[in-house]
Amino acid sequence: GQDENKYDGFLQSSLYQEIFCNDFLGQVPPIDLKKEKQFHDFVMKLNDNEIINSAHDISDGGLLPCMIEMLLFNKLGIDINLPTKIQTPNEENLLFLHGWLFGEDQSRIIISTNKPDKLMEFSKSENIKIYCIGKTNNTGVVEIPKYDSICINKCLDLYNNTIPKLFP
């Protein structure tokens, strides 16, 4: 539901705001119900036409947590394709990067496919904006170029062991 020109994200009333700011204030992300329905119909058509392997909305935690959830159990990695505006690390871009990675904007879904050309063609015919956020690989590392990297095995360990450690 977005293209490369969308490089910020909605952080008000988000999990990010709650964790990093110890706050949960502000408006919830705005939603255009007509656009939302169009977008979900589009994803259903992609599925019906066997163009996608999986789809996951980013509403809880944003793009990065969603990507990690999708990669976790297959221990895959991804080279993230950052929007041009935030590819150069500096203070302003770091703020935009956090919004892009953790914003809980509506009408954003991560789709995995083995048919990227068909996906692009179909999105144009349906007038839906899409952006290739990256390509998966077998490294087990989420690579955020020029910023950071995240080891999927560490995420899997946290996923499997956090609750047992808190409640022995």
Q: Can you name each region flagged by the protein language model?
A:
Residues 31-38:
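C-terminal transmembrane module of polytopic alpha-helical membrane proteins
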Residues 25-27, 40, 46-168:
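Glycine-/charge-enriched secondary-structure boundary and capping motifs
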Residues 1-31, 44-47, 105-106, 113-115:
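Mobile "lid/hinge" segments at catalytic clefts and subdomain interfaces of large enzymes
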